[in-house]
């Protein structure tokens, strides 16, 4: 699976800022399906932890609000060490600046506010 195809699907989503994280997951799932991208939702790969979306080695991690940078980096550090993870796309409501690579894996930030044009 090419990251570009996933990013194209994500760029088609326009959501209200009143949606909760579960509703955002539904919108992402709908966009991925429309673009014929097969995914696993709430994919359990770590004990007591699930990836929001798993797409052939690419993890989509969804955050409704702006997370703590340290907390996010710690989470991404754990995720990038999981065998089979090739890249992580972090879908955020607000942008956070983090490295573009971690443990040799690509990290991409997709900001709802900047890239999706949240509707009110």
Question: What do these predicted ranges mean?
Answer:
Residues 33-37, 55-58, 82-86, 105:
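Short glycine/proline-enriched coil/turn segments at helix->beta-strand junctions
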Residues 46-47, 72-75:
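Amphipathic coiled-coil/heptad-repeat helices and related helical stalk/stem segments
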Residues 44-56:
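Catalytic centers of nucleases
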Residues 1-44:
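Acidic-basic catalytic patches of nuclease active cores, encompassing PD-(D/E)XK
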Residues 117-120:
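C-terminal interaction segment
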Residues 53-66, 79:
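Conserved catalytic cores of phosphodiester-cleaving nucleases, focusing on short active-site segments
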Residues 30, 74-81:
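Surface-exposed alpha-helical segments enriched in charged/polar residues
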Residues 66-71, 80-114:
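Nucleic-acid nuclease catalytic cores
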């Amino acid at each position: 699976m090419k990251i570009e195809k996933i990013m194209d699907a994500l760029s088609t989503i326009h959501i209200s800022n009143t949606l909760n994280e579960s509703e955002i997951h539904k919108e992402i799932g709908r966009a991925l399906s429309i673009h014929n991208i097969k995914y696993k939702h709430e994919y359990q790969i770590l004990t007591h932890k699930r990836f929001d979306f798993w797409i052939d080695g690419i993890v989509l991690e969804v955050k409704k609000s702006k997370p703590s940078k340290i907390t996010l980096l710690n989470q991404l550090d754990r995720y990038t060490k999981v065998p089979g993870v090739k890249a992580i796309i972090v879908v955020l409501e607000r942008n956070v600046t983090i490295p573009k690579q971690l443990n040799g894996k690509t990290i991409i930030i997709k900001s709802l506010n900047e890239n999706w044009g949240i509707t009110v």
